[in-house]
Amino acid sequence: MVALNIYGQQLDSRLLIGSALYPSPHVMKQAILASGSQVVTLSLKRQNPAEKAGQQIWRYLQEVVTEVNGHLLPNTAGCKTAKEAVTLAKMSREIFQTDWIKLEVIGDDYNLQPDPIELLHATEQLINDGFKVLPYCTDDLVLCQRLYDLGCQVIMPWASPIGTGKGLMNPYNLETIRLRLPNATLILDAGIGKPSDACLAMEMGYDGVLLNSAVALADNPVLMAKAFGQALQAGEQGYVAGIMDQRQTAHPSTPTLDTPFWHQN
């Protein structure tokens, strides 16, 4: 299969995985390894040097990223304005030594929907400052087009609100974005609940999936991480193989013409 391209970096896995909500740092590490992911998201807040737990998580993250030859993807979770997001992105670049940033600017506290106006403002500022921006957005076609026009090579529309596990609420919107932005790297982000959701996204032609809660909150996070890795592979292979068109009428898979009891109506 073709490698996932994120701003010139070739990755074997199309799964991006978060580092929050796990029962323990050890489970987090084992789940990330089981997933096969080479990109791990994290927030600056989780790396508080004054907290021993934060130090332990940071050590595990460094170990796993080194082991899989992967990349850290800092995010701007919790930011509500472009100014806040830009400030946090610059801090993250200095601390984590990466110009990748998962840009989140939340506009509503209830469903954690991104603020499109502030998101566009922050994107423009960060790109002008040399960042490689991976914006988290809704499944709004025009917003995705504007982000692409600003210079985002990677765009991350949601499947459904963060942490809901509702899966792909708007398949039509997501398919339209894929059709209208054929050259963008599209990664489905947020709302994924089960491996079949991720598989469906790949069957649509999406380039990857980013998730966290679906693995971290599973009864067995390590096994669920492995299941998601396999689901993405299955979906990608199905898309590349070419999925049959749906039909309005039934067609027998076994030809009945000239069989002993063939009937013609």
Curated annotation (Swiss-Prot):
Keyword ATP-binding: no
Active site: 102 (schiff-base intermediate with dxp)
Keywords attached to this entry: Cytoplasm, Schiff base, Thiamine biosynthesis, Transferase
Gene Ontology molecular function, alphabetical: thiazole synthase activity
Reactions this protein catalyses: [ThiS sulfur-carrier protein]-C-terminal-Gly-aminoethanethioate + 2-iminoacetate + 1-deoxy-D-xylulose 5-phosphate = [ThiS sulfur-carrier protein]-C-terminal Gly-Gly + 2-[(2R,5Z)-2-carboxy-4-methylthiazol-5(2H)-ylidene]ethyl phosphate + 2 H2O + H(+)
One of the record's GO cellular component terms: cytoplasm
Record's keyword annotation contains Cytoplasm: yes
Protein name: Thiazole synthase
